[in-house]
Amino acid sequence: MARRADPTPAVFVFGAGKLGTALARALRARGVATTLRAARKGLPRTIRADVVVLAVRDRDVGPVAERMRDAGVVPVRAVVVHVSGALDAEALAPLRGSCAGVAQMHPMISFASPDVVPGLARGNVHVQGDARAVARARALARRLGMTPRTFPGLDAVAYHAAAGLVANGAAALAAVGAELLARASVPRDVAPRMLGPLLRSVADNVEKLGFPRALTGPVRRGDVAGLEKHLATLLAKLPEAVPLYRAAAEAQLPLARAIGDAPAESFDAIARALGRPARDGG
């Protein structure tokens, strides 16, 4: 039996920053009636929506929820969700009793600019909270082409730190890589256009192959000579990047050992080149 299509809700997004604006644009592109309101304009007199999305800073989620409750602007039939990764649904507790339910709806996607809507298809959304709000949030995620997931007992701070480590860390590493490319005579305006596809290929490998198989490069191959050349070049051209390169290579070693494309002695040699004991144990 075919699965029934999720009904199209009306959505009100409060907060016109990077995430809120991009989310509103993505919803409209998929035929969802969406109202976007900047937080600096304050609350409207009334909200006509089935789903109210708070896309504000973490510290503002609770206070905004309290103001919405006190102003009585949320329809009793509506659900309210926030998009913070570090806060669970309890941040919206002030609104319980004045709406149909509250939930966390955090897209594990990087939103860097209100002018760029990132690819949402195949992305994941963590949803947690009251049953009715969770159901509507999951339906909204599916309409965006994303996969809704719920992890009972999730440590929200650790979850958010993991997302930040990958998303923010990758952007920072790419910036360092772009600087090294510039010092290797690649035009600065070209470097981002080279590194973007490279990062997408890494993302594809991570998604499709998982770990440790997503790893590539000299550490996986056990190529200590290649790694030492990299370190020497970095020391000459961009010495401030050496600690980053060493830390990244150290993180690769357990993956490379698990893959086993080279003898253990090769990985021991890499560990010594990085200034670490030959084995981490085992």
Protein language model features and the residues they cover:
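NAD(P)+-binding Rossmann beta1-loop-alpha1 motif at the extreme N-terminus of oxidoreductases
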Residues: 1-48
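Phosphate-coordination loops involved in phosphoryl transfer and adenosine-cofactor binding
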Residues: 8-10, 77, 122
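Short, well-ordered alpha-helices that flank and scaffold nucleotide-derived cofactor binding pockets
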Residues: 21, 25, 29, 66, ...
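Internal alpha-helical scaffold of NAD(P)-dependent oxidoreductase catalytic cores
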Residues: 23, 95, 101, 117-208
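Rossmann-like NAD(P)(H) cofactor-binding subdomain of soluble oxidoreductases
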Residues: 40-116
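Interdomain hinge/lid region at the active-site interface
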Residues: 204-265
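NAD(P)-dependent dehydrogenase/reductase Rossmann-like domain
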Residues: 256, 264-282
